[in-house]
């Protein structure tokens, strides 16, 4: 039987009596997930369709092609996109950590920035993204969609209504959006 044992700073995954994964949070190692950094491309690896980014951590982060926003594309993509046509070594990029460093692997990075607020998630460089949390269904979903349509948001940004947005007025959501836009 697989189980997950969680303590304040330790997570252990066990199968029967066998430990198969252990993650210990140490006070010396700060969490980087969701942090946003200005990084520099150090190496482009066409075979992996990815780039390695120096963002200030001891290991360089991994940035796959699918996680690169269209704002970094020099020209509109025609057919299959080659990462060398999108990025160049030494180029500066704004990245967000999606997955922490683990073992000998660097952090997984994205250029699709997301800023989580109390009721909304703002995606400043992803205008096509947005909607309602997947956990919300039925009539509540329709009500939130109407509230979302009533928000005054920049056209080049995406928004997602979080589960905490349930039962909130358009004014409360607009306040949250205005706060996120100031960041």
Which functions belong to the PLM regions below?
Residues 1-183:
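Single-stranded RNA-binding surfaces
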